[in-house]
């Protein structure tokens, strides 16, 4: 039974290795292109449709490389605190991606390019800040070693690429004063410059094992860029494409096309691998509106026009790009690569076989670990103890050390494996259990916490209190000054104590003196509503009302129609005429010497001839029964008209 089980396990390992080494269209992961954006890795199929995203927990992704032998993607995060380079693998059972730290951060690295050697399982990367190219194995915790040091010569390594079959490393030197494309053996020997002329700022570079050529991006002067290629020794240099208004970073090559990421347009572009213009160094410059100094021959068309194709629009700035090439299947019979492919396959199969055998032998221990030790704890059968991972404790690793550790903050495990709290604004202490305002403000002061973490909290003091913590009682301080002022009248008392001393003097004037300041009324708030102001205001209002009344009355008198004046003339004589029986003194005109004429304008002013205004007889008759209105009608009896 053991032999049968062992044979089945070996067969399973071989089948698994075969699946890992199948071409792109047969992979269970079903992606063909992977692009790093700023905060994620985006996977796309052959038609550039997004099928998955991963690495969302990272903040500043940049470089990217791919190991087809084990389906591992290696990428860099510029802002991660602990790690510099990470690996990403698809979990077929859980259908998700698992990211693990591969290279720890040792300083302020700035990775420009990444490359992987599947034979020795080494990662190579360029550091644009230190101006060096490093390498380190993906397993273990070995310190990265320097393969190429360009700092002394002022170089700036950018893109890197590994020629797996010929065991060489290629890189671009983007130093604008002396740009180059160079190579070196993977053991650090035989460094060679293969391109050093007619180049401005080379960026990404890739080795095409199918055509045995190099492809790189050159960020030309001005707004131009180009994609060029040459043989692996630098000969047969060709310009595949020259265009403008792009800011390309990295590129990838398939069997028939070139793909590159563009930061300006946030897109991935493609162009056939067929070159458009061949470059030499002995011909006249190309006649076009360009600011670079590259010498070109007359354009020699190599094929039909091949326009650019924008294959993918991205939501963020595009950076690294890798493509699945089916390297291990297509190069099995290549005379340069056959031996390397065979060795890689053997290593993968052997590695998986050892893994399966070890799993079989440790199966019982694994069960014990799962049942006995929680949270990934390691079970020690000899001592029957659990070795807990960082962040857990207890006999079975069941207690999370950060659980309820920080009262007002976030808990993280420190480098020394101790829980550490990062407090919220306004709190402090080892466990963020103390408020920065606790006991700070005295005497009822209100504590204010600024949003700026570097600014200390402040106190807003109530009335009659001051100081940074409201610890100064103005009443007590001023009472001391005012008591001393009682004995030393010339002593200076702060101005703010005046009102306080007045209040204290009302209760205890024997011991309290009120300071008198010259021109104190200038400093005090003026009293507006005094008695004189009120009197003047009232007089002004009354005068204004009287003036308005006079004006209104005058206007009414001016526009009121005049009443007509009634004039009556009466002739009075002493002797009546004898020749007329009907003559009476009131009807006969008197003689010239014996008569007078009375002109009556207003009965109310009958004082001219001392003649009464009313007829006496009628007055006597109607006195008892006439009203005031009837009196007006008897103002002179026998008048020709009724005046009223």
From Swiss-Prot:
Residues 1-26 form the signal peptide. Residues 27-531 are extracellular. It comes from the Eukaryota. LDL-receptor class B repeats lie at residues 121-166, 167-211, 212-257. Its main location: membrane. Residues 398-430, 433-471 form the EGF-like domain. One of its GO terms (cellular component) is plasma membrane. Disulfide bonds join 402-411, 406-421, 437-447, 441-459, 461-470. Residues 286-301 have a biased composition (Acidic residues). One of its GO terms (molecular function) is Wnt receptor activity. The chain crosses the membrane at residues 532-552. InterPro entries: 6-blade_b-propeller_TolB-like, Cueball_EGF_LRP_Nidogen, EGF-like_Ca-bd_dom, EGF-like_dom, LDLR_classB_rpt. It is found in: Cell membrane. Residues 553-644 are cytoplasmic. Glycans are attached at residues 82, 108, 175, 190, 313, 473, 508. GO terms for biological process: canonical Wnt signaling pathway; oogenesis; positive regulation of circadian sleep/wake cycle, sleep; spermatogenesis; triglyceride homeostasis. It is a single-pass type I membrane protein. PANTHER family: PROTEIN CUEBALL (PTHR46513:SF42), VITELLOGENIN RECEPTOR-LIKE PROTEIN-RELATED-RELATED (PTHR46513). This is Protein cueball. The lineage of its organism: Eukaryota, Metazoa, Ecdysozoa, Arthropoda, Hexapoda. The gene is cue.
């Amino acid at each position: 039974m053991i032999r049968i089980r062992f044979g089945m396990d070996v067969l399973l390992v071989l089948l698994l290795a075969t699946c890992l080494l199948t071409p792109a269209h047969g992979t269970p992961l079903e992606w063909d292109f992977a692009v790093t954006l700023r905060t994620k890795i985006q996977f796309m199929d052959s038609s550039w449709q997004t099928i998955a995203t991963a690495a969302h927990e990272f903040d500043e992704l940049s470089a990217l490389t791919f190991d087809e032998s084990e389906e591992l993607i290696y990428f860099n995060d510029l802002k991660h605190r602990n790690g510099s380079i990470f690996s990403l693998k698809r979990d077929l059972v859980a259908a998700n991606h698992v990211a693990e730290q591969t290279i720890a951060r040792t300083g302020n690295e700035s990775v420009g390019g990444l490359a992987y050697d599947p034979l020795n399982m080494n990662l190579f990367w360029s550091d644009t800040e230190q101006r060096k190219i490093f390498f380190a194995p993906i397993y273990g915790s070995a310190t990265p070693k320097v393969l190429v040091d360009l700092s002394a010569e002022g170089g700036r390594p950018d893109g890197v690429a590994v020629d797996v079959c010929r065991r060489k490393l290629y890189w671009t030197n983007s130093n604008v004063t002396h740009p180059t494309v160079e190579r070196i053996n993977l053991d650090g020997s035989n460094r060679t410059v293969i391109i050093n002329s007619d180049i401005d700022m080379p960026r990404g570079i890739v080795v095409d094992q199918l055509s045995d050529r190099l492809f790189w991006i050159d960020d030309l002067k001005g707004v131009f860029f180009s994609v060029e290629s040459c043989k692996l020794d630098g000969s047969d240099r060709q310009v595949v494409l020259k265009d403008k208004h792009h800011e390309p970073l990295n590129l990838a090559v398939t069997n028939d096309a070139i793909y590159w990421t563009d930061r300006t347009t946030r897109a991935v572009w493609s162009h056939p691998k067929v070159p458009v213009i061949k470059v030499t160094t002995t011909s006249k410059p190309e006649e076009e509106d360009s600011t670079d100094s590259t010498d070109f021959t007359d354009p020699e068309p190599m094929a039909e026009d091949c326009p650019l194709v924008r294959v993918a629009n991205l939501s963020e700035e595009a950076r690294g790009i890798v493509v699945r090439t089916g390297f291990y299947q297509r190069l099995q019979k290549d005379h340069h690569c056959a031996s390397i492919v065979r060795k890689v396959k053997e290593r993968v199969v052997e590695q998986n076989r050892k893994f399966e055998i070890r799993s079989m032998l440790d199966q019982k221990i694994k069960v014990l670990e799962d049942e006995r030790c929680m949270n990934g704890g390691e079970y020690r059968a000899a001592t029957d103890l659990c070795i807990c991972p960082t962040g857990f404790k207890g006999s079975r690793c069941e207690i999370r050390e950060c659980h309820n550790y920080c009262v007002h903050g976030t808990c993280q495990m420190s480098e020394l494996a101790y829980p550490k709290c990062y407090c919220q604004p306004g709190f402090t202490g080892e466990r963020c259990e103390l408020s920065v305002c606790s006991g700070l403000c005295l005497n009822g002061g209100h504590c204010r916490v600024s949003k700026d973490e570097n600014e200390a909290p402040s106190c807003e003091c109530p009335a009659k209190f001051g100081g940074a913590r409201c610890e100064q009682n103005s009443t007590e301080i001023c009472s001391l000054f005012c008591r001393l002022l009682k004995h030393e009248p010339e002593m200076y008392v702060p101005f703010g104590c005046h009102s306080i001393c007045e209040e204290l003097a009302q209760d205890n004037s024997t011991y309290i003196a009120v300071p008198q300041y010259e021109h104190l009324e200038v400093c005090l708030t003026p009293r507006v509503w005094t008695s004189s102001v009120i009197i003047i205001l009232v007089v002004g209002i009354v005068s204004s009302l009287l003036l308005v009344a006079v004006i209104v009355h005058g206007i009414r008198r001016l526009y009121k129609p005049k009443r007509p004046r009634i004039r009556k003339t009466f002739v009075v004589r002493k002797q009546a005429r004898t020749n007329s029986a009907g003559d009476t003194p009131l009807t006969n005109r008197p003689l010239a010497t014996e008569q007078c004429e009375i002109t009556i304008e207003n009965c109310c002013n009958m004082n001219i001839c001392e003649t009464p205004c009313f007829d006496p007889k009628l007055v006597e008759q109607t006195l008892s029964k006439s009203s005031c209105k009837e009196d007006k009608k008897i103002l002179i009896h026998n008048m020709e008209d009724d005046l009223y």
